[in-house]
């Protein structure tokens, strides 16, 4: 089963790892992980590491935990490869769920079948709020959700 997920993945935290773990449970080695291009990542308010470093961090996580090198692609537009490739599943967070609905709407307009959306709940930090890259960058929590 072909599975996709995407994101900026910076810094790579427990919430990201949960998304990757769910994708691998669904698709095994047949996963495509989209990592946003530097241009797309720079559209965010906070600074992020270059694409090559972010992609390498994701690859390293999968290789260490699962023993294989995942397919990693650069996302240069909001849809990534989801309009071109017939994925079975699209793994998303609550933050990216609306975009997943737009992807399926666009796929329908193109005469393609919808992708099954798998929404993975937030990973909560010690304070009961979601772990997020923004909160980590602000120094509120660490990558594991611990209060700093």
From Swiss-Prot:
<dbReference type="GO" id="GO:0005737">
    <property type="term" value="C:cytoplasm"/>
</dbReference>
<keyword id="KW-0067">ATP-binding</keyword>
<keyword id="KW-0548">Nucleotidyltransferase</keyword>
<dbReference type="GO" id="GO:0015937">
    <property type="term" value="P:coenzyme A biosynthetic process"/>
</dbReference>
<keyword id="KW-0808">Transferase</keyword>
<comment type="function">
    <text>Reversibly transfers an adenylyl group from ATP to 4'-phosphopantetheine, yielding dephospho-CoA (dPCoA) and pyrophosphate.</text>
</comment>
<dbReference type="GO" id="GO:0004595">
    <property type="term" value="F:pantetheine-phosphate adenylyltransferase activity"/>
</dbReference>
<dbReference type="InterPro" id="IPR004821">
    <property type="entry name" value="Cyt_trans-like"/>
</dbReference>
<keyword id="KW-0963">Cytoplasm</keyword>
<dbReference type="Pfam" id="PF01467">
    <property type="entry name" value="CTP_transf_like"/>
</dbReference>
<keyword id="KW-0547">Nucleotide-binding</keyword>
<dbReference type="InterPro" id="IPR014729">
    <property type="entry name" value="Rossmann-like_a/b/a_fold"/>
</dbReference>
<protein>
    <recommendedName>
        <fullName>Phosphopantetheine adenylyltransferase</fullName>
        <ecNumber>2.7.7.3</ecNumber>
    </recommendedName>
</protein>
<dbReference type="InterPro" id="IPR023540">
    <property type="entry name" value="PPAT_arch"/>
</dbReference>
<dbReference type="GO" id="GO:0005524">
    <property type="term" value="F:ATP binding"/>
</dbReference>
<comment type="similarity">
    <text>Belongs to the eukaryotic CoaD family.</text>
</comment>
<keyword id="KW-0173">Coenzyme A biosynthesis</keyword>
<comment type="pathway">
    <text>Cofactor biosynthesis; coenzyme A biosynthesis.</text>
</comment>
């Amino acid at each position: 089963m072909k599975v996709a997920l995407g994101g900026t993945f910076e810094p790579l935290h427990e919430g990201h790892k949960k998304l990757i773990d769910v994708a691998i449970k669904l698709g095994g080695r047949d996963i495509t992980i989209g990592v946003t291009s530097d241009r797309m990542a720079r559209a965010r308010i906070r600074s992020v590491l270059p694409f090559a470093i972010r992609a390498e961090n994701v690859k390293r996580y999968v290789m260490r935990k699962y023993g294989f090198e995942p397919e990693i692609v650069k996302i240069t537009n909001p849809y990534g490869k989801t309009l071109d490739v017939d994925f079975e599943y699209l793994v998303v967070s609550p933050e990216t769920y609306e975009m997943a609905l737009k992807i399926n709407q666009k796929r329908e307009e193109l005469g393609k079948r919808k992708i099954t959306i798998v929404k993975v709940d937030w990973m909560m930090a010690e304070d009961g709020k979601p772990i997020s890259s923004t909160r980590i960058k602000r120094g509120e929590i660490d990558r594991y959700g611990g209060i700093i």
